[in-house]
Structures are given as C-alpha cells and as structure tokens.
Amino acid sequence: MKPLSRRQEQVLQATVHHYVDTMEPVGSRTLVQRFSMPASSATIRSAMGALEQRGLLTQPHTSSGRIPSALGYRHYVDCLLPEPAATVLHLERELTGLSLGWAALDDLLLQLARRLTDFTGLMSLITRPTRTQPQLAAIRLVQSGERLLVMLVENSGHASHLNLRLPHATSDELDAIERWAEQQLRGGALNWEKLPTQLQRSGDVLRHALEHPSISAEPTTLVHGLSRLVAEPEFQSAQDLGPLLQLIDDEPMALISPGAEARVLIGQEHPQSALEACSVVQAPYRCGQEGTGHIALIGPMRMAYATACSAVERVARHLELLLS
C-alpha cells in the first residue's frame, strides 16, 4: 500500500482526535478551524476523500462528515500516536503510594484496576500471574476430627487454604508430614518421591489436593469499571451489549489475547466476536517465578489510545517493581 502523505496523516490524526472528543462526524471546514490546518477547506476535503477511498475514514450518513474506521484507528495507533499527556504523571504519583502487604496481592491488583479506570474512564482488567504450580513457602496442617485444614503460604505472600477429608491420619503423621514439607521447601519445592513410606498414605491425599487444578490452573481475574463500559453510547443496544456482558461474566480471561508483548487489538482483530465493537489495550507484567499476569483496558474503538497505552504500560512496570 502506498504510504500516506504528510497532509493525509495530519487529517487522519485530527479526525481521530475530533471523534474521540466529540463522537461527532467531522467535515473539512471544522478540521481547518479547530486544528488550524495550513490548507484550504477544499484541500482538506480532498485529503479526506483519499483517506475514505483507502478505507481509513468512513462516512456514516449521507451528507455527513467522516469518522475513523477500524483500519483508520489501526494506522493511527501504529504510526501517529502522540506522546501521552502530562496528566499521566498524576497517575504515576498515585502509583508511588501503593505497596504490597502480606497476603494482599489481590487487594493491590484491585486498587490498580480502580486507578486505571478512574484515570482513563475505561473498564480495566488485571489477572494474577499464571502458574503451573504454586511456589510454596510454608504448609501448615490443622486436624479437626476427620477433616484436615491445609494452610498454604506462597513466596509472593499470598495465602490460601484447603479443607480435606482425611479420616485415617494421626496427629503424629501430620506433624511428620509438616516437618518433611518444611525441609523440602528449603530446597525450593516438594519432591513427593522422597516422602517416607510410612507417611505416603496421608501424603498421597495431600499431594493430590495440591496438584488439583483449582489451585494451579486458572488465574484470578479482577474486573473494574463495567459501568463505564455499558454507559458508552456504542453499547446502548441489547444486541451489542448482551454478548459482551456474557463474555465478561462467564469467561473474563477471554478478554485478554494470549501473548508476551504489549498489544492494541482493534475491533475484529480480537478473536472474540463479542469484542468487535471494542478495542483492548493490554500489557503483560512478570512476577519472577510466579509467572506472568496481564493488565488491560477495554472500551469502544473511539478511545484515547495514547493515554490508554501509556497508563497500561506504566501500571505494568510499576507492578513488576512491587513484585520483584
């Protein structure tokens, strides 16, 4: 495809900014006046026509102005994204006041999601790091009749518990398993092949519970700002909103597109058809041995991409610092 001329790029950028601000189609006269373009209205109108022919602008109604198409937004994000506004510095100052307390990772992620939504006006989503198996720092076993409470403390400080039925275990067995686990974890992980034979009957039950998918498979997904999304004019019909709400409710992880790099997915670029009227701005964050989580902003294609991209990247890097 032939590259855009400098004037065509200026017109596309101005059209995107106008539509994001006003949600109104724009004509050449308004662009000249609002953005002080050094060209006549006829020249700008010609550039808009060329952009429409290339699929970067579209004319929603007869005799109306133009608005960006999904392809136009893509070119804008890839080639014309301006530097983020100075207001992003305000977000950075807010982030410096956050810290990770003992067993408070989910609380921290929720605070970050709230700040992202408040700053951008978009729905935010943050996942806890994915892991194939939790990195344990300690295991505590508490017996109550035929039930066993297993308390797990991970290296990240996150705490969880399991409630198992273990009628045949004795207190001496459980004490021995706890001591064995403590010694094993000093070396980094539990090696069940080294569990003493006399402890294997009770140990096998515990091993099965620790390897159950409820602990290790699907990361926690925190969503904030759904009310902001449904308030957008683009999502006022049940036909547009219904599939999106169902996806958020049933499978929020599907909002994130797999990948190890920051990405902006616009409209039908996203594999989920429920998001074809949306854009998703996402970035990964890494948490040492804990794995990788994701931060994302979801909104209409008509979004302030420079602010959204900058905010997601800054929160991801700040979270990595807190978790390092």
Swiss-Prot record:
Coiled coil regions, renumbered to chain: none
Stored InterPro entries: GAF-like_dom_sf, HrcA, HrcA_C, WH-like_DNA-bd_sf, WH_DNA-bd_sf, WHTH_transcript_rep_HrcA_IDD
Keyword Nucleotidyltransferase among record annotations: no
Swiss-Prot/TrEMBL GO biological process terms: negative regulation of DNA-templated transcription
GO molecular function per UniProt: DNA binding
Domain of life where this protein originates: Bacteria
Keyword annotations: Repressor, Stress response, Transcription, Transcription regulation
Gene3D superfamilies: 3.30.450.40, Heat-inducible transcription repressor hrca homolog, domain 3 (3.30.390.60), Winged helix-like DNA-binding domain superfamily/Winged helix DNA-binding domain (1.10.10.10)
Parts of the chain that traverse the membrane: none
Function: Negative regulator of class I heat shock genes (grpE-dnaK-dnaJ and groELS operons). Prevents heat-shock induction of these operons.
NCBIfam families, A to Z: hrcA
Listed HAMAP family: HrcA
Similarity remark: Belongs to the HrcA family.
Name listed for the protein in its UniProt record: Heat-inducible transcription repressor HrcA
Organism: Synechococcus sp. (strain CC9902)
